[in-house]
From Swiss-Prot:
Main location: cytoplasm
Lineage: Eukaryota, Fungi, Dikarya, Ascomycota, Saccharomycotina
PROSITE patterns hit by this protein: GYF (PS50829)
GO cellular component, one term: cytosol
UniProt protein name: Protein SMY2
Biased composition annotated in UniProt, kind: Low complexity: 452-467
Example GO biological process: nuclear protein quality control by the ubiquitin-proteasome system
SMART domains listed in its UniProt record: GYF (SM00444)
Keywords: Coiled coil, Cytoplasm, Phosphoprotein
Amino acid sequence: MIAPDSQRLFGSFDEQFKDLKLDSVDTENNNTHGVSTILDSSPASVNNNTNGAVAASVNTVPGSTFRSNTPLLGGRHPLSRTSSLIDSIGIQRAASPFSSMKEPFIPQSSGVMSSSFWHGDHPESRVSTPVQQHPLLQRNESSSSFSYAANLGVNLSTHSLAVDITPLSTPTAAQSHVNLFPSSDIPPNMSMNGMSQLPAPVSVESSWRYIDTQGQIHGPFTTQMMSQWYIGGYFASTLQISRLGSTPETLGINDIFITLGELMTKLEKYDTDPFTTFDKLHVQTTSSDSINLNLAPYASGVAATGTIKATENDIFKPLTHDNIWDMDGGTTSKGVDIKLASATTISQTDESHKQEYKSTTMLEKGKKEKSESVAKALLDEQEKRNRELKRKEEARLSKKQKQKEDDLLKKQKEQKEQKEKEALEAEKQKKSEKTKKDTQTQTEGFKTSKDLPSLNSSSANPAPWASKVKVNNAIETSIKNGVSSTGKKKGEPLGLQQRNSKEEKQKEELKSVLNWANKSSLPSNQTIDIKSQFQKSPKGMKESSPLKELEDPNFIEEQKKLWEKVQSSSKQVKSTSSASTTTSSWTTVTSKGKAPIGTVVSPYSKTNTSLNSSLTAKTSTTSTTTTFASMNNVSPRQEFIKWCKSQMKLNSGITNNNVLELLLSLPTGPESKELIQETIYANSDVMDGRRFATEFIKRRVACEKQGDDPLSWNEALALSGNDDDGWEFQVVSKKKGRKH
């Protein structure tokens, strides 16, 4: 069926198109202010019609006409059919703003214009307008009218246009303006209401690691590889896996090794691939976050409402079917105002977003304040605990310091009390000793005054010159000290220090007495009247032997026997006087000869060693010469001292007794060898100190092992005398012929 008025339709379309071209040129020359049109650049927005549209294209070749027939029609008018309701059943009238727009399928052939026509810049079709245009909702590509129009093509060789002259429905104003704007002016990121399109979900592929049965870590591997191995049955539910924390995830398994069964439990998926399922959950989380981020810039409702109102004012007035196609009698057109969204709805949405944003901000602020308050409370509690610990520590230290001070004071107090007690005891002891000493001296003096005649009953015949001899004062002092020391030994003992000092003093006095006796010995028949001496010195009467010793009959008998021995030994002095010329005061010394030391026998027996030395001093002073002459035995210590003096060749001005006294004070062990050696080298230039020290220690040890010597070292040294003057040194020259 041929549609009526087809020639008129083409003629009217040509005229209308020329008018539109002129209008567009005039508009470009006016340069009116307006907002540039922002449309979607996809070619699908150019050719889709809601109720069916005429697919028409303008041939840019000169000389083309709309009234020429195509070669395919053979000079006939193109067939057309009336629209039917079936064509529009199941067709989506408007495309979803959330679905991606696709370009229409246009068959490419040598007889059909290329797709560059759809995207080309046609000056005659560009219309500059200050009015901002809204993008149209896209139509589903399954429309029958779109398919029918798309199947029509333009034969470029004949410059003819195939047009569906029977539209399915009356075109709208928006459909009439689709081909007037090229797709190059439409930005690709615009969507309706001036808001940017939502980004497509970004697919994230995770990286995984796993630990094998030997404990070695392998990876990282992608989700695809892990899924293939899982599907192949290589992974057990006990396999330990870990996801690399390159991107955030919702399950909290980044960089943590968990078993595959635990991952499936967290995902609550037991019959699917856990790796792919995890990535899907992760992508959904990322997409929801991107939606929230895209809505955030439009939280202000004032700006969005102003933009929508400006768009409503600047939109083109819709063009009707009559003023485009200039058709007589037919269908009437209705003006359609395109409003993509209601301002009220948008403002309400913006307000809701604003309220949500405010509520979120308040919630975050409340959480922040609460966390700060909790942190502050924790800090205060920690500081309080630290202060309490510090206070306890200081209290403990102060208590410990106080206890130390108390202990120190207590100790000092005890020491002070102990010293005071010791001082009181010492003072009491001194007082008691003094009183006892006074009483003893009084009683001893009284008893000795009665017993003195008995001591002088058996005196020897005095010499003619006995009355002229004056006794040295040292004899009297030695007798007094001997008597007093005897009384003290029988009484309470003195301190160790006092006893030692008195013994040393007594030995020195005895030494002086013995030396005097050796060098100035009296004749054999000379005696000393002890009675007259005691009468001259009344003090000696008080200091006599103790009462018990004088009353003892055995003591008196022993003294008598000793006195008889002294008298009997005086007869032998005549025979030995020639041998002891150096000790007699009547001989003349003609040369420095070595003086022989007379044999000295102790007047004490072994049973009488406990007696006081003062009594011996008495007997020895009464007859000193006869006593020494009567001694037949020689003490081992005297022999040792004699050997020492024979070996010692000291420097001038140094006496043998002083050096021997020092050497005898040292111990007998080998530790004294070096000291003896150094002493000899210091006091002699010719002696071999090393050899002398060795022989000295050897002989001394042998002497002390005998144990039957009644004399001590000091007594033996005192009896040996000081015969340093008898030494005579002679320098011996080296003999000729001797090498050594």
